[in-house]
Amino acid sequence: EGAYSHLAVQEFFPGAEPLPCKTFEIALNEAEIGNVDYAMIPIENSAAGRVADIHRLIPKSNLHINFEHFQKVEHKLLIHPDSKIENIKNIISHEQALAQCSDKIQKLDLDILIGADTAGSAKKIQDEKIIDTAAIASSLAGKIYGLKVIDDNFANSVNNITRFYIMSKNENLEFDETKTYISSFLFSVKNTPGSLLSLIHISEPTRRIH
């Protein structure tokens, strides 16, 4: 609770009740068996690149990609409400968030602790009343776990976006001519030189239609 996936659900499905899952595989399975209407899965990040394992899991699922959502990632530096910046010796978060905030971490000369995720790192500080460690997480996580924001823009870059797929068992969505649609292709090629290039050439248009 309080992760960037939670924020993405709030923005794309206002009023919906999110069901947190420990793994992407569990999230996809929950949608497959009908326990939830949609699985909202991060695919790639503008700073960190492709999210590990997702492209391996999608072909194994029986879900369809219905929508996509681009979530702005704004890393906050959070501390326990009883702490001060001069008390901070360590910093904890998910390894990708730590990498995306490396410039300021280096300036503060903090020891790095790897957390399972951003929201869980924030929760740990509150639950264990840790005053010598800061967490990198979202503003939502700070609000949920009652932490104090000491840096509102802690990331190396302000242009940090995560792309999500919204997937479900429904493949027959109503067409809306006022919206723009895209197609996603998932394929594999032989492990030989030029295989990918050959496929790209096949997909190129042979003539321009006016």
PLM feature segments, named:
Residues 8, 14-22, 29, 33, ...:
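Regulatory modules associated with amino-acid/nitrogen control
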Residues 200-210:
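Single conserved hydrophobic/aromatic residue that forms the stacking wall/gate
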